[in-house]
A protein has these predicted regions:
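Short beta-strand scaffold segments in enzyme catalytic cores
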Residues: 27-42
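Short glycine/serine- and small hydrophobic-enriched flexible loop segments
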Residues: 16-19, 34-37, 86-90
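Zn2+-dependent cytidine deaminase-like catalytic core
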Residues: 4-5, 12, 40-178
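Short, basic/aromatic recognition patches
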Residues: 2-27
Length: 178
């Protein structure tokens, strides 16, 4: 008899956390572990005690025609990774040496269903992960395979290159005139 891997087990839990998301465009769920125990969870949602997009009945970014991946400050929601880190801080939980698992889905414009996509933290979340002391990030993918990153590799890359050279975060190299 075989069992699913621990990474798949935790990514499945992150998927369930994502189902609490209150974003019309996407659902993301994050869990953070220390010593093989879940210490925090987070999903895409509005700040505590404020109305989310579902309650308001609209997406502010859609109304302003803001493309996906841009102008995050014009979104009512906080990202799943950020919420998981914030929830740990609120509970006084130390994240040093922890592992973050992230599951992501995007709404399909044709079917209205949410399809699993390759998860990857935005650049702001990546910086928060680094500063929180999390050591490892495990990302879900549409293929069902997980991708594992050592946060120390991100730091090393940013030490030898500029932050704008982070092709995985940006999808392309920014062309900055000096």
């Amino acid at each position: 008899m075989s069992r699913i891997s621990k990474d798949r087990y935790y990514l499945n839990i992150a998927r369930e956390v994502a189902s609490r998301s209150t974003c019309f465009r996407a659902r993301h769920g994050a869990i953070i572990l220390r010593d093989d125990q879940i210490v925090s969870t987070g999903y895409v949602g509005a700040p505590r005690k404020t109305k989310d997009c579902f309650e308001r009945g609209n997406c502010l970014r859609d109304e302003l025609n803001i493309p996906s991946g841009q102008r995050y400050e014009m979104c009512r929601s906080i990202h799943a990774e950020q919420n998981a880190i914030i929830n740990a801080a609120r509970a006084g939980v130390n994240l040093l040496g922890g592992t973050l698992y992230l599951h992501s889905e995007k709404k399909n414009g044709e079917t209205g269903e949410y399809d699993v996509i390759d998860a990857y933290p935005c650049f702001i979340c990546k910086k928060m992960i680094v500063n929180s002391g999390i050591e490892k990030v495990v990302l879900d993918s549409k293929s069902g395979e997980s991708k594992v990153y050592q946060v120390s590799d991100w730091v090393s890359d940013w030490q030898s290159n500029d932050l704008l050279d982070d092709v995985e975060a940006y999808g392309e190299k920014y062309q900055v005139k000096k």
